[in-house]
From Swiss-Prot:
Disulfide bonds: none annotated. It comes from Oceanobacillus iheyensis (strain DSM 14371 / CIP 107618 / JCM 11309 / KCTC 3954 / HTE831). Belongs to the metal hydrolase YfiT family. Possible metal-dependent hydrolase. It is found in: Cytoplasm. GO terms for cellular component: cytoplasm. This is Putative metal-dependent hydrolase OB0782. The lineage of its organism: Bacteria, Bacillati, Bacillota, Bacilli, Bacillales. Zn(2+) binds at residues 64, 155, 159. Binds 1 zinc ion per subunit. Keywords: Cytoplasm, Hydrolase, Metal-binding, Zinc. HAMAP family: YfiT_hydrol.
Length: 172
C-alpha cells in the first residue's frame, strides 16, 4: 500500500451527475463522525505519531482537515457569489508547523463537525447550474464547484485512510 496515497490520488474523468454529487456530499457529511470515531480513544503519544516517515502526525492531520475544509467552504462561497474568483492558496506544510497544531484535537473535531453541517447544508441547496460555477486556483486553473465537491470528498477519505492505516499497522 502507498502510505502517502492510501486510497490513490483523486481521479474523476466522467460526467458529474446529481447522483455522484449527492454521494460526494454524503461522504463529506460523514467525515466528522468517522474521524471522531477513529481518533477518540488515541492517547497523546499515538496522536503525535507520524502516519508515515516524513509525514504529519495524526494530530497535524486532524488540524489540517479543519484548515483545509474551512478553505474549501470559503472557496465555495466565493464561487457562488463571484464570477470565477481567483482564490488564495496557502502553504499547508507551513501551517502544519504553527503552534495551534499542538492544541487538543477536540478543538478541530468540534470545528470540523460544525463546519461540515454548514458546508453540507449549503451544498445541498445548490442548483445544477451552481455546480458548474468555478473559481480559479493560481496553479490548478479553473475548478467547478461540482468537481471541488469530489476533490474534498476524496480529501477527507484520503486523510482518514492515513489515520486508519496507521492504526491498523500499529495494532491500535
Amino acid at each position: 500500500m502507498n502510505e502517502k496515497y492510501p486510497i490513490g490520488e483523486f481521479q474523476f474523468d466522467g460526467e458529474i451527475t446529481n447522483i455522484i454529487i449527492n454521494e460526494w456530499i454524503n461522504e463529506i457529511e460523514d467525515l466528522p463522525r468517522l474521524l471522531k470515531n477513529t481518533v477518540i480513544d488515541l492517547n497523546n503519544e499515538q496522536l503525535d505519531t507520524s502516519y508515515r516517515s516524513g509525514g504529519w502526525t495524526v494530530r497535524q492531520v486532524i488540524h489540517h482537515l479543519a484548515d483545509s475544509h474551512m478553505n474549501a467552504y470559503i472557496r465555495l462561497k466565493l464561487a457562488i457569489t463571484e464570477e470565477n474568483p481567483v482564490i488564495k492558496p496557502y502553504d499547508e506544510k507551513e501551517w502544519a508547523e504553527l503552534y495551534d497544531y499542538n492544541l487538543p484535537i477536540e478543538i478541530s473535531l468540534s470545528l470540523i463537525e460544525a463546519l461540515h453541517k454548514r458546508w453540507c447544508s449549503l451544498l445541498r441547496d445548490l442548483s445544477p447550474t451552481d455546480m458548474e460555477r468555478t473559481f480559479k486556483h493560481p496553479e490548478s486553473g479553473s475548478i467547478s464547484i461540482g468537481k471541488n465537491i469530489g476533490i474534498y470528498a476524496w480529501h477527507g477519505k484520503h486523510h482518514l485512510a492515513h489515520i486508519t492505516s496507521l492504526c491498523k499497522r500499529k495494532d491500535w
